[in-house]
Structure formats: C-alpha cells, structure tokens
Amino acid sequence: MLEQIKNNFTESIQTQIAASELLGPSIEHAGMMMVQCLLGGNKIISCGNGGSAGHAQHFCAQLLNKYETERPSLPAISLNSDISTITSIANDYQYDEVFSKQIRALGHNGDVLLAISTSGNSRNVVKAIESAVSRDIPIIALTGFDGGDISGLLGEGDVEIRVPSARTSRIQEVHLVVLHSLCEIIDTTLFPQGDS
C-alpha cells in the first residue's frame, strides 16, 4: 500500500513536469484571454462534470472572492452551482442541455467560456461549446487524453489546454495547477503588486 501511495506521488509529479514543459504558452495565452475579457467588462463562465464541476466552481470562487491577494471581486459564473436550474433543465429536456441553455441565456459576446472535461467527450460540455460558438464566445478548454470531441470544435480564437495523460486523476491534478496559474496571471496582470 505504501509503495502505491509513493507511486501516485511520483506519477503526479512526472505528469506535472511534462505538462509544465508542454502547456506553458497555452496557459499564458488563456490567462491573457481572460484578462482581456475582464478588462472589457465581461465575465468568465465555467462548466464541467464531477471533479471538473468542482474545479469550475473553485475557479469562479477564486475570481469572485480572491486568489492569494486582496483585490476587487471579478465577474464569473459557474454553471454547475444552481442545482434547481440544472435539475429543471435535465428533467424538462435532457442532461446534455444543462449548460448550453444557461449559456444561451447568460452568455454574451466578449465573455469567455472555460469548459473542463478530462476526456473531452462530455456531451453537456460539448453542447455548451456549441452554444458558445453560436454566440461568438471564445472558449478555453481544459482536457486530457486525446482531447476528445471538444478538440475538434475549437476554432482559431480558442485555446485547448490538454494534459498529456490518459489517467483521469492525473489530469484533474494538473487541471487544478492550470486553474491556479490562470488566477495568478489574472491577479498579477490586473492588480500588480510591485516587486513581489
């Protein structure tokens, strides 16, 4: 058992090192997309399922409250947060529509969609991206494996941050580091703290 625990840490570290070497430019580009969105008076909309739903909510909480330094609240909406809306849409239509209907109601040109799916194949996230595309909302997709269906939906103005792993747990661990890196880019760009 102890050996397996050690192996988990080793594999996580190796995946994070590989991701840091591969994903830096994409993370930086995504962070600056978010900065421009916020400077334009727009909002970041996030969605995902399971652990990715938790990441989507966590990211929005970091923007609405703070990341590591005191600053004004920033506009962000997690489409996972309103259980009444999610269950209403799932019951009256289908679960595939729980995010796309919200985007059609809440999303506007100038916003950014942060779509999180470890497999890249989550149907409701795919439909969210399709709704965002129809509203000219740029997409930042956090994926893993081969990028799945999501990878094929992204256009020139979108960014895919694909973790180089085929293991969901490792992908989710790197996604959290990516999200914290995005928070740091936003905070240090919008609210520079001097030499710190």
UniProtKB/Swiss-Prot annotation:
Which residues does the record give as Zn(2+) binding sites? H58, Q62, Q172, H180
Q: Which Gene3D superfamilies did the record assign?
A: Glucose-6-phosphate isomerase like protein, domain 1 (3.40.50.10490)
Q: Which Pfam families match?
A: SIS_2
Cofactors needed by this protein, per the record, are: Zn(2+)
Catalysed reaction, written as an equation: 2 D-sedoheptulose 7-phosphate = D-glycero-alpha-D-manno-heptose 7-phosphate + D-glycero-beta-D-manno-heptose 7-phosphate
UniProt KW keywords: Carbohydrate metabolism, Cytoplasm, Isomerase, Metal-binding, Zinc
GO molecular function annotation: carbohydrate derivative binding; D-sedoheptulose 7-phosphate isomerase activity; zinc ion binding
Q: Name one GO cellular component term.
A: cytoplasm
GO terms in the biological process aspect are:
carbohydrate metabolic process; D-glycero-D-manno-heptose 7-phosphate biosynthetic process
Q: In which pathway does it act?
A: Carbohydrate biosynthesis; D-glycero-D-manno-heptose 7-phosphate biosynthesis; D-glycero-alpha-D-manno-heptose 7-phosphate and D-glycero-beta-D-manno-heptose 7-phosphate from sedoheptulose 7-phosphate: step 1/1
Q: What is its EC number?
A: 5.3.1.28
Identify the SUPFAM superfamilies for this entry: SIS domain
Subcellular location per the Swiss-Prot or TrEMBL entry: Cytoplasm
> Which positions make up the signal peptide?
none
Extra notes? The reaction produces a racemic mixture of D-glycero-alpha-D-manno-heptose 7-phosphate and D-glycero-beta-D-manno-heptose 7-phosphate.
What is the role of the protein in this entry?
Catalyzes the isomerization of sedoheptulose 7-phosphate in D-glycero-D-manno-heptose 7-phosphate.
Can you tell me which family this protein belongs to? Belongs to the SIS family. GmhA subfamily.
Name used for this protein in its record: Phosphoheptose isomerase
Organism, by scientific name, is: Colwellia psychrerythraea (strain 34H / ATCC BAA-681) (Vibrio psychroerythus)
Q: Which gene encodes it?
A: gmhA
